[in-house]
Amino acid sequence: MGVKSFDEGRIKSAEVIQLITLYNLFSRKESRNIIFQGGTALRWFHGNERFSEDLDFVTSLSMTELTGLLNSLAVSIETGIKAQFGPGAFTLRQKDRGREGSVTAFVEYASEGQRGKTMVKLEFERLKAGASPGQEQVILSSAPAVSYFIRTGQVMFPPGRVVNIETVEEIFSDKIRALLERRYLKG
């Protein structure tokens, strides 16, 4: 089993693609029913500096509604990525993980002349009926880590996009629960 290696340039590209994806996802009215969570939410909104490659969400949308939303986002995400990185090959593909109540998608991009591609994984889990995790609404461009990327010209998008994010307490609760339920040791 190989170990993933990330170089600094690939990490920065992945982070820019994460931000473009978040911006476009939360531009849609359906996003009122989506909450951003996990390690990347800690990275962008709660001051954690550790790179996290996945965008994790919980949602009250049906999996059919979510699949339709993801399909409708492809053009706007591609446009944002190409505006940032220039011409290249883009895909937004969904993968059936065989788990009911979950959708996994991949945003992939390779700039012309670039070896390999940059990939960001999106994971959506359906909320249990009546569940309402602790959340807050934050303007994407006001988060310090995001603001830094904007100020330094690493990403460009208009201000004002509101993102629903889990509270830090809720994210840590999820992390502890995942550790307790895990059947294997993760390095």
PLM segments and residue spans:
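Helical scaffold of the NTase/Pol beta-like nucleotidyltransferase catalytic core
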Residues: M1-I35
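Catalytic cores of NTP-dependent nucleotidyl/adenyl transfer enzymes across multiple folds
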Residues: L19, Y23, G116-G187
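Short secondary-structure junction/hinge motifs that connect adjacent elements
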Residues: N33-R43
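Signature of the catalytic double-stranded beta-helix
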Residues: T64-Q84
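Conserved catalytic core of two-metal-ion nucleotidyltransferases
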Residues: E78-E125, V162, T167-E170, D174, ...
